[in-house]
Amino acid sequence: MSDESASGSDPDLDPDVELEDEEEEEEEEEVAVEEHDRDDEEGLLDDTSLEGMCGTEHAQLGEDGQRPPRCTSTTSSQSEPSEQLRHQGKILASEDPKKKRAQKPSHMRRNIRKLLREDQLEPVTKAAQQEELERRKRLEQQRKEYAAPIPTVPLEFLPEEIVLRASDGPQLPPRVLAQEVICLDSSSGSEDEKSSRDEVIELSSGEEDTLHIVDSSESVSEEDEEEEKGGTHVNDALNQHDALGRVLVNLNHPPEEENVFLAPQLARAVKPHQIGGIRFLYDNLVESLERFKTSSGFGCILAHSMGLGKTLQVISFIDVLFRHTPAKTVLAIVPVNTLQNWLAEFNMWLPAPEALPADSKPEEVQPRFFKVHILNDEHKTVASRAKVTADWVSEGGVLLMGYEMYRLLTLKKSLATSRPKKTKKRSHPVIIDLDEEDRQQEFRREFEKALCRPGPDVVICDEGHRIKNCQASTSQALKNIRSRRRVVLTGYPLQNNLIEYWCMVDFVRPDFLGTRQEFSNMFERPILNGQCIDSTPQDVRLMRYRSHVLHSLLEGFVQRRGHTVLKIHLPAKEENVILVRLSQIQRDLYTQFMDRFRDCGTSGWLGLNPLKAFCVCCKIWNHPDVLYEALQKENLANEQDLDVEELGSAGTSARCPPHGTKVKGEDSALPSSMGEATNSKFLQGVGFNPFQERGNNIVTYEWAKELLTNYQTGVLENSPKMVLLFHLIEESVKLGDKILVFSQSLSTLALIEEFLGKRDMPCLPGAEGQGTQKWVRNVSYFRLDGSTPAFERERLINQFNDPSNLTTWLFLLSTRAGCLGVNLIGANRVVVFDASWNPCHDAQAVCRVYRYGQKKPCHIYRLVADYTLEKKIYDRQISKQGMSDRVVDDLNPMLNFTRKEVENLLHFVEKEPAPQTSLDIKGIKESVLQLACLKYPHLITKEPFEHESLLLNRKDHKLTKAEKKAAKKSYEEDKRTSVPYTRPSYAQYYPASDQSLTSIPAFSQRNWQPTLKGDEKPVASVRPVQSTPIPMMPRHVPLSGGVSSASSTNTSMNFPINYLQRAGVLVQKVVTTTDIVIPGLNSSTDVQARINAGESIHIIRGTKGTYIRTSDGRIFAVRATGKPKAPEDGRMAASGSQGPSLASTSNGRHSASSPKAPDPEGLARPVSPDSPEIISELQQYADVAAARESRQSSPSISAALPGPPGQLMDNSTIPGTALGTEPCLGGHCLNSSLLVTGQPSGGRHPVLDLRGHKRKLATPSVTQESIRRRSRKGHLPAPVQPYEHGYPVSGGFAMPPVSLNHNLTTPFTSQAGENSLFMGSNPSYYQLSNLLADARLVFPVTTDPLVPAGPVSSSSTATSVTASNPSFMLNPSVPGMLPSYSLPFSQPLLSEPRMFAPFPSPGLPSNLSRGVSVYPGYMSPHAGYPAGGLLRSQVPPFDSHEVAEVGFSSNDDEDKDDDVIEVTGK
């Protein structure tokens, strides 16, 4: 499990708060990040992101109770009309399946969807861009009118940086000056290179283009332009002190405003680049003292690399803000492990007045006059936190808190003082303290007012790249802040993909870059398409153009300064990559693991979260002892050993337990928030089990037992990585250099400690004569991970950095705990033991030593296992870093890898090259590395190389001025015109799954053998047009009494696919290439259901119809139908729904109470059988039935036409769907209550009630009384007939279609032998007397199809039959079968009710046809589910969804190929 700092879990939170963190983690796993998160665009083999994985965090995602709508994945293949805007409620799948193109491999380039025209952009986007344009124009005007003696930027604003549109700003009349030159041809930069005459600003005025020319006196040299590419105030030649040593902040201010200077102690400390950063913050957040009072301000991103002193710049700006503006409160949200560091920085640079000595001079040191409040681990209760917040609001000043603390205090669902632990059974009633509840509500209101609405005057987010998942609850909470003055501090603005960058920019400048879809079309896809070595020349050109445009759009409020600033002031830094060979045991384990994965097919690499594989492989290539220990302990939390942020969520993870503690199984599931390919909560595996427990979702190590049977632990040489690590440690100590070792695996850190305890320390310089010493923790080495308390961290860091400390030489750190807010300049050597998925983490780890204060040359060693997944991850790091350099730094890194190399994670080499006997060390200058190559050449696959060599800036690829203008021009033209690109599918084509490895035999069976499989089925496209809402799907219990357990619930549904196939059901696993949206209804509590593109689903086709089963257990019944028939009351009639006869439900649980009395106003009234409505509907039925018989064709799909209550359904024949839907009946549309006859024979029942399924009659009829008496007496028909061929069902028996239906043409009129079980509440003439010849076969006492039910003659016959009635056999329209029992089903679960159907009868008019289907209906619609009793104690719980249905009808001429997805969800 990722440790505390990695997750950022707040140590100042009590255990209840930690539970909230776990909830955040679980919720951010469910995002979509689409997320990603957002890691949501970071799917394993995601063709959209070079990250490939993400969530979300993950996640992520709206985790509060009121979840916001998910962002539509930019890689989703659903068709989006170009008119779609941000606030549209629905996404229509309008793409014609005939127009779909063949899918492309993931590594190939992708086309770009239609771009939105300029007039289709969101108004908020236009307004945001216009505001920024006007702000920059005002600043430029001030620079011209009030020129400072020492300007900070060139006096002339770079002309090509301003691109105006007529709709965005006032038009300027074209003017031509004598010295101007108009350049109409921008295809080449030769003219610009030959001449330094003039710049050109392109202005578009709607219909025509007008060129406005700027005088040549305002042109800017190429060198100045180079300096401008990092944003404003980046020219350090102008960021200088004045003659008196002061630092003026508000350059070019109006004369009526006062000069704003830094405090003297700050002015002496700041460096030129920091002066530029302070001025940059002032320009964006304040702009001018007068405008601060009237405007809401702007946000900005201070993107200085790690170690450039962002904290000092912010402290200096806060001091200026409080001294010269009316601002009163500043909220600083920082990672929890940097809280103490921030407080120490404030006290050092701006000491409190009482901390100053009495003789201090104001001209030397100015104390702060504001207070610094902090919420840390000392504030355990909500009341104490509320007091700190209230003091901050009343007194003003700065409030420091962690990200998780802010989320907990601002999200309504998170705030709680304590949470009672979940128990299996409550022995006493729950007592609710109303006064405490009122206090909690008051605290919540106070927090919301102080932190969000209206919130502080300025918000500062340190390490702001954590705001990378637009749907993560932390991001959502931050965006709720009303203040627009938002500052993000980050040394790594672009980590994994451009969507994360967009999310962070969207926080500081909402809507500036448009919606996520607009940004993806304009920038993300073009930039990604040209990133690799196999990209087309057009792709590369467009990539370079769009990278420059994106950089120039943001340079007004994103200031980027890189490590080039540090190189001037710090010693040299050398970063080498050592590619390490695997030992024999490691290679055997790795081969075995890969073999199992490949044999698993789509359920392996393409179906599992790759982070699980990464965890297992990390144990292999770090050292087999780590894998062996996990195998021996059977640690349920093994996959959370990795200290990786994404393993928990895009934003946070649960706190890492202290080393050696046991983690509960339910918290051990490996989340998949690295930008999951789908957004399902827990995607299931091949087994049909939608109720799989999360605790079972773990990685097992059965596959490794045989190889590790006689394994000898404690052998250092079993891992070449470990051998090289100890060589680097010992040689560094011999040279007198302190060294840091970073690993993301906590178990690996523990193993390193074990080996250290067995080895002697090397001889220190000058101490050769002294005896040897052992490595001792907290004496000769330190360890820091997420479980280290904050105060202990500070002590260890200060002690390690102390130059007088000559006993401690080694510091072991977890990558996520030690990469933020830790200053370890006491060391000058770093070993990154394993590569992180996110390159930001390794880069931040390196910068712990390479920062201000470092006195020695720095050496960094990256150990990477070659020919493994780790090498692929390192390659991805290079690609991500190259994209960051290109977009953020406007550099031109080399293209080193093909897209296939980057995106294909499955890297398996059967045979490694032979070990080398020697390595060429001519290019290696560092002595420790030279000695390693000489001593261990057989452990290294190739000569070590510098990490920066893969990121060289190709200055020859730098855009010329003309190319830059062409880039901006093409960008503007693309926005103005709708580019006619085709719109193929952008899906990932890979079914993402979070299933457990235990569900795959290859990983759970020791002697498993792979089975031969045929070719994979082709990927199918399943596209819905209309659908019904998701009703409740009952969970079924075994026949034994009592409440069902989780295990029994699981096993009841977890039958294998081959069982279905043997039973004659076709099961096909396919991958959807487009999002399938299943809209809900206003009358339903269900929101839109969705099957995401790339999700693995099963198509189940049998005699009862066609179904779709998703990987998370949802079942969709596919129907062919068309447009709905308009009912008289203007609403869609809910057909087959059951009203007051249903048992009441509460919170998803079946209630044992009797049904409530029906509301007379809501019940339908009986209709006279002589009414014109009935006669006309009977005639309609007769016509259709006759037409069906006359066709003499194969059975067709019947589509139900709903109508008002009591109205008969019409049938129309619709061709089969593309899925090959079998003939089926409109399931819930035809119920027994809708069976009619013509004129009642004999006049026995003068009243014809066609609405019996809506309610029971107020006064039971004589027929009903007789039915109840017969039911209680238990009349049973004749013995069981021999089986013929039958219907396969999962309950353990088969239903013969012929022997039960030999009397289907018998008259409907009631006879003496009528089956009383099926009478229901309707008059007897509605019932089919001999429709089901044998009740014991329909309601068998035994579930074994081979054991016929024996005769029962006791008085308990009815009870026996009732107790064995499978719940799926209950027809919703027969509520009278058991008068005292209320059925829980609101509609059929399968495709059609076969129990009763309107078969021809002499009782109908003579012109009605006798034509019937091939398989006349006789079964319940619940025939596909296991048998369960009718006892109330056995009725499973149900979700508290309101059940609503929508029927659809169609004419044969309209929408013949429309599909309707009938959903039966949990």
From Swiss-Prot:
Residue positions binding ATP: H304, S305, M306, G307, L308, G309, K310, T311
Record note on what altering K664E does: Decreased sumoylation
Polar residues: compositionally biased ranges: 1135-1154
Domain Helicase ATP-binding: 291-511
UniProt-reported outcome of changing K1013E: Decreased sumoylation
Family matches, as InterPro entries: ARIP4-like, ARIP4_DEXHc, Helicase_ATP-bd, Helicase_C-like, P-loop_NTPase, SNF2-like_sf, SNF2/RAD54-like_C, SNF2_N
Post-translational modification: Sumoylated.
Modified residues (Phosphothreonine): T1259
Positions with biased composition (Acidic residues): 11-49, 1451-1466
Residue stretches of biased makeup (Basic residues): 99-114
A single GO BP: positive regulation of transcription by RNA polymerase II
Phosphoserine modifications at: S1168, S1171
EC primary class: hydrolase
GO CC terms: nuclear speck; nucleus
Predominant localisation class: nucleus
Localization, UniProt: Nucleus
Keyword NADP: no
Annotated ranges, domain Helicase C-terminal: 727-895
Chain location of the short sequence motif DEAH box per the record: 462-465
Domain remark from Swiss-Prot or TrEMBL: Leu-Xaa-Xaa-Leu-Leu (LXXLL) motifs are known to be important for the association with nuclear receptors.
Family, similarity comment: Belongs to the SNF2/RAD54 helicase family.
Quaternary state and interactors: Interacts with AR via its N-terminus. Interacts with DYRK1A. Binds DNA and mononucleosomes, but does not seem to form large multiprotein complexes.
Function according to Swiss-Prot or TrEMBL: DNA helicase that modulates androgen receptor (AR)-dependent transactivation in a promoter-dependent manner. Not able to remodel mononucleosomes in vitro. Acts as an AR-coregulator in Sertoli cells.
Name of the protein this chain belongs to: Helicase ARIP4
Organism: Mus musculus
